[in-house]
Amino acid sequence: MFHPRARTMLLLSLPALIIGVASSLVLIAAMKIASVFQQFLWQRLPASIGIAYDSPFWIVGMLTLTGIVVGLIIRYSPGHAGPDPAIEPLISMPVSPSALPGLLLALIIGLAGGVSLGPEHPIMTINIALAAAFGSRLFPRITALDWTILASAGTIGALFGTPVAAALIFSQTLSGSNDIPMWDRLFAPLMAAAAGSLTTSLFFHPHFSLPIAHYTQMRLVDIASGAIVAAIAIAAGMVAVWCLPRLHELLHRLKNPVLILGIGGFILGILGVIGGPLTLFKGLDEMQQMAFSQTLGAGDYFTLAVVKLAALVIAAASGFRGGRIFPAVFIGAALGLMLHAHVEAVPAAITVSCAILGLVLVVTRDGWLSLFMAAVVVPDTNLLPLLCIVMLPAWLLLAGKPLLAANRHEP
């Protein structure tokens, strides 16, 4: 009844569904545990001893302690809590399963402790390793590369609550041929991404969109404004690109992860005191609070963007286990709101979406993901043509430029 191509796709459907659901459940479990732990550390515990959670003493002390604990996990756990996210790309080959408990624990403590990184890199590493370890036993004919693709697609769908991001990302890597069309290759990853996003939606839905005024009609001047905003965001991001490898090398001369992360946590605490609680944690909930605030002005948005960018660099350079996409979205939103406050003639929909596009492009160097993040934070179909046009000069600016990553050091 089915063509052999269709039968091949159907055979991959079951593993794809299982991987997608499992990827989402791992993410949900980690986020729920981190959320409970965060409420205890930042609400119940300080209230029980009569200290304000936003006091300088508590912020500096909590982040310093978080750094020390994560450092102890990295030093003494099997596999040293997985690869350093500052060195490894978001999607890479499977790591040893023995490193996963330490990696998961380091992630949860970092998220709960207020570190300015998201969950995407460790969750991706965990899901890829689990998929390869269990999948190779259950379905030995499927290669490790296929398990990596399915797990990463399922994780992307779970992280962003939609399979669209995975479809966009893998459409540029799983190109078709005369024998196998691109959509044949995309079928199983898209199935995994759909399963991951639907499973996530049963428990919670990521809140990316901001309450920003509707963009009515594209004008020529808006394209120029958007390109300038994206260029400003790229310039800010390139400062981080320059700083990260140098700071990473400087800190890792100490050799001891407990000392490195303790110092990193202390600096993050100082930055948290300067920027306030909005600059702590992964940034999604804080971005909503920032957008809904009626008291913040241009200077406040500028401070939030600069402090969060510095915190992102410090956290990544120190070796905290976390991702850089979610903080980059926060930085882009803060930068966009600041630019709109300075030049109100440029709609906030343009400044925010184009700033996010520029920052995420610097962090990921992935045009589709950058467009996707800009479009989901400012969900306005009238903006899509403008964002696609603005992407062109932004991509030209970054062509051949170094990535936001540290260099490997000899032990």
From Swiss-Prot:
SUPFAM superfamilies linked to this entry: Clc chloride channel (SSF81340)
Entries under CDD domains matching the protein: Voltage_gated_ClC
Keyword Repeat among UniProt keywords: no
InterPro entries: Chloride_channel_YfeO (IPR022969), Cl-channel_core (IPR014743), ClC (IPR001807), ClC-type_chloride_channel (IPR050368)
Topology relative to the membrane: Multi-pass membrane protein
TM helices/strands, residue ranges: 9-29, 54-74, 99-119, 149-169, 186-206, 223-243, 258-278, 296-316, 322-342, 343-363, 386-406
Gene Ontology CC: plasma membrane
Compartments, as annotated in UniProt: Cell membrane
Gene3D superfamilies for this protein: Clc chloride channel
Gene Ontology MF, one: chloride transmembrane transporter activity
Keywords linked to the UniProt accession: Cell membrane, Ion channel, Ion transport, Membrane, Transmembrane, Transmembrane helix, Transport
Key word Ion transport present: yes
Pfam families tied to this protein: Voltage_CLC
Family membership noted in the UniProt record: Belongs to the chloride channel (TC 2.A.49) family.
Protein name per its UniProtKB record: Putative ion-transport protein YfeO
Phylogenetic lineage: Bacteria, Pseudomonadati, Pseudomonadota, Gammaproteobacteria, Enterobacterales
